[in-house]
Amino acid sequence: MRGTLYIVAAPSGAGKSSIVNATLARDPKIALSISFTSRAPRPGERHAEHYHFVSADEFQGMIEAGDFFEYALVHGDWKGTARQSVEPQLAAGHDVLLEIDWQGARQVRQKVPDAVSVFILPPSRQALDERMRKRGQDSEDVMAQRLAAAREEMLHFEEFDYVIINETFDIAVAEMCAIFTASRLRRQAQQQRHAGLIQALLE
């Protein structure tokens, strides 16, 4: 049985990575695909754990070689998911989660129409602003650009299957887990997973 592909997107500062990490800790059946990026690591970020950090030239080379499942220019830097991180795992029956932006999500849905997509929203504009400022990693000019980009990102929430409002972290994580559980209980998935049982029951 082929694995399920999950897409999770959110504006910067909505708590996407924290929710994803907490959810995956509860649900080890899902593998997180580590994205490639051309930007420099931020303080505390480690290669191959948070991102695969490569130069812009290396990223372009991967584009030309057709190595990416999806890629997009995000906040002036390239981000993308390698084919090798997704296609073999799905074919082997493993569930894979992509933590990407709306541009990448749109590309993925064109290739995998049955992918399950989730968009995370902040509880308010004020909360988004406060969360972004707590990072303390950007200048005011960069902060203004990121807030504008966050608004642009949120305009695309209607393209996703599920929406989570991250007002209370534990509730948001529980809602993400519920989405994964519901996906596994879909009739098509259960029909494949329990084909022998269903056949025996209906004989």
UniProtKB/Swiss-Prot annotation:
Residues 3-181 form the Guanylate kinase-like domain. GO terms for molecular function: ATP binding; guanylate kinase activity. Coiled coil: none annotated. It is found in: Cytoplasm. Its EC number is 2.7.4.8. Its main location: cytoplasm. Belongs to the guanylate kinase family. This is Guanylate kinase. It comes from Xanthomonas euvesicatoria pv. vesicatoria (strain 85-10). The gene is gmk.
